[in-house]
Amino acid sequence: MIRADLTDIPTYVPGKNLGDALKLSSNEVAFPPLPAAVSAITEAATGANRYPDMGAVELRGVLADHLELTPEQITVGCGSSALCQQLVQATCAAGDEVIFPWRSFEAYPIFARVAGATAVPIPLLPDTQGHDLEGMLDAITDRTRLIFLCNPNNPSGTTFTEEQFEAFMQRVPADVVVGLDEAYFEFNRAEDSPVSTEAVQRYPNVIGLRTFSKAYGLAGVRVGYAFGNPELIGAMNKVAIPFAVSSLAQAAAIASLNAADELLERTEEVVTERERVAQVVGAAPSQANFVWLPGEGAAELAGRLAEHGVVIRAFPEGARITVTNAAETDRLIRAWEAVHHG
């Protein structure tokens, strides 16, 4: 009755939430949705008896203006994670290969396996914790259909440069799709980092992926967007679940896009606190809303911080700590000092 290979597919594990503890394990923002988004959600709720616009025409139009693309180059989904899944399904058949950095977004190997594809993880560079772009190129075979790049990378917070990306793309076969995952784009202050809206204009095999879950504070309503070659976008739409993006999510996203100044102010606070947290915990520079502590002992560190009311994310390769606002940073620092100097 059930696919035999499902037993071997890992289950996605979300960040822990321990009661009243400070949750710094899921890269959520501390502030609520923008006021305009809250108002839009409230208004849209009165029409919740009707199906949402399956084509998200208004939202795609606003996104087109925001991104300087055409609506035909854009699709929306139930978070960028759903769009990653659609991209795998649109490009891969059983036995095809999906290359991605590792450690990176935890769901990449899951998406590949669910589609019957082979997951090909390429370890991060040990000295920088960045993408091993050369190693990813070396891993390409005649079965490779898709490569995910995560920029900034989750959980390391590292980025690659425009020059590195261009050199990479020059060697990627034209029939291999590159998904440029920019879930943390709004927190990225690296001046030499590639931007997917520009990349998709140069490369028909590049798809940009972004979300409203992080900087926009809409993780609970689930809405993201992808953009690129209309042919690829159309293929992604073919494998989408109908009516996946609710009317509330579409309304909230439109309102959020129209409040860019407020968003910038909020992300600047995160950037300021990011430097503060990195200095206290000894983390390398990050371009996302978290910092990364590579190495062993992450589970022990997470356990000790939890005893002091702070929840972080422990991976086998290291610990990730979400960065939010000044008040929560103060609380994190108190717990950190209690663990290390108490």
From Swiss-Prot:
Enzyme Commission number(s) from the entry: 2.6.1.57
A GO BP annotation: L-histidine biosynthetic process
Cofactor (UniProt): pyridoxal 5'-phosphate
InterPro entries (UniProt xref): Aminotrans_II_pyridoxalP_BS, Aminotransferase_I/II_large, ArAT, HisP_aminotrans, HistidinolP_aminotransfase, PyrdxlP-dep_Trfase, PyrdxlP-dep_Trfase_major, PyrdxlP-dep_Trfase_small
Pfam families xref list: Aminotran_1_2
Keyword terms, alphabetized: Aminotransferase, Pyridoxal phosphate, Transferase
Reaction it catalyzes: an aromatic L-alpha-amino acid + 2-oxoglutarate = an aromatic oxo-acid + L-glutamate
Extent of the signal sequence: none
GO molecular function list: aromatic-amino-acid transaminase activity; histidinol-phosphate transaminase activity; pyridoxal phosphate binding
EC top class, as a word: transferase
Transferase found in the keyword field: yes
N6-(pyridoxal phosphate)lysine: modified positions: 214
Function: Aminotransferase that catalyzes the conversion of aromatic amino acids and 2-oxoglutarate into corresponding aromatic oxo acids and L-glutamate.
Family: Belongs to the class-II pyridoxal-phosphate-dependent aminotransferase family.
Subunit architecture: Homodimer.
NCBIfam families, per database record: hisC, PRK03321.1
Protein name per the record: Aromatic amino acid aminotransferase
Record organism: Corynebacterium efficiens (strain DSM 44549 / YS-314 / AJ 12310 / JCM 11189 / NBRC 100395)
Encoding gene per record: pat
